[in-house]
């Protein structure tokens, strides 16, 4: 029987914080050092867009804690209006975070530019990007069906506004905040449910918490002084390693220096409620973010996961694919509601999960905002083809199931894991052992 044991010190740096650190550095006056920047394709796309829009970006490898090699990024800027007109469309590849959040910055620059991406990104909805920026005074043009390319005619005369987000979205909240930094006056962003709050934490923005909403206050045209950033390990990447340990009985794994921001690590509480053998140790605060070690000691398995609370869904939206596959394989059951946002990710993740789980013999039923796994009616004989839909989280979720259970799965376009987890397979090999 295959089990997984060891100490993980090479988990990818947090993708969300890496994006934001680079963008905030480009808006700051002076030189910013970002330690432990992500090597994932998405974060490298952000650096590429910054370079091609005139920002000085340097990247090098340095020795860090636990003897690991990490990336240090150094970004030099003169402040809010340091960008220059690009000579070609800005390529975001597969990174929706890059395309959406950079739109907010570029809408405030006095030139025209275009943001493009790969085939998957060019299908994703961008109207939610255009609407607030148009209200602030930028000219934004999309394709007829509301997708990229995003053509931006920016202006230094952006207006502040009060904007209520129609759905919880950390990317849309952040792009408005980045645009608002350039505007005259004070902007207020109202979110009905809390989304990940890295932008507020990193910029030190005031947040007003009311009964049914949160208000983020962004003062306009404030000087941002360069400051260093340290990027902790990505909790979304940690979820895959946790699932690996929980699916393979007898596994013992420690994951070091993981971001435990409550808006990112809520899935840990969910798993604890399901009687999963996990714990947290060595908690501390670095750069405003809670960081700690996650311990996995799997002796008893877990109970089925049923997810419906809208706030919880907003917090764990990226981890749902892995949690669904984990619950299905470990218990034969899973239930999800209020997660329609999953249909607008790198793939329609509800459809992708249901299609692949059905191929593996699970009885599933999907709804507009979720799906249910009722039971496993058969275990297919021989190798089963899994369709990744060119989505890194779908590919990794089923790869974890294959590694932990020994089932033979042939996953299409498996190289897509490099979007967020370049050392995914090498890390699994390091942890693998025979019981």
From Swiss-Prot:
Keywords, sorted A to Z: Amino-acid biosynthesis, Aromatic amino acid biosynthesis, Cytoplasm, Transferase
SUPFAM superfamilies: EPT/RTPC-like (SSF55205)
Residues annotated for 3-phosphoshikimate binding in this entry: 15-16, 20, 169, 171, 195, 318, 345
GO cellular component: cytoplasm
Keyword Cytoplasm: yes
Binding annotation for phosphoenolpyruvate: 15, 96, 124, 171, 349, 393
Superkingdom of the source species: Bacteria
Reactions catalysed according to its record: 3-phosphoshikimate + phosphoenolpyruvate = 5-O-(1-carboxyvinyl)-3-phosphoshikimate + phosphate
UniProt-listed GO biological process terms: amino acid biosynthetic process; aromatic amino acid family biosynthetic process; chorismate biosynthetic process
Residues of the active site: 318
Chief place of localization: cytoplasm
Entry EC no(s): 2.5.1.19
Metabolic or biological pathway, per its Swiss-Prot or TrEMBL entry: Metabolic intermediate biosynthesis; chorismate biosynthesis; chorismate from D-erythrose 4-phosphate and phosphoenolpyruvate: step 6/7
A GO molecular-function descriptor: 3-phosphoshikimate 1-carboxyvinyltransferase activity
EC top class, as a word: transferase
Compartments, record wording: Cytoplasm
Family note: Belongs to the EPSP synthase family.
Record's subunit section: Monomer.
Record function comment: Catalyzes the transfer of the enolpyruvyl moiety of phosphoenolpyruvate (PEP) to the 5-hydroxyl of shikimate-3-phosphate (S3P) to produce enolpyruvyl shikimate-3-phosphate and inorganic phosphate.
Name this protein carries in UniProt: 3-phosphoshikimate 1-carboxyvinyltransferase
Species, as recorded: Chlorobium chlorochromatii (strain CaD3)
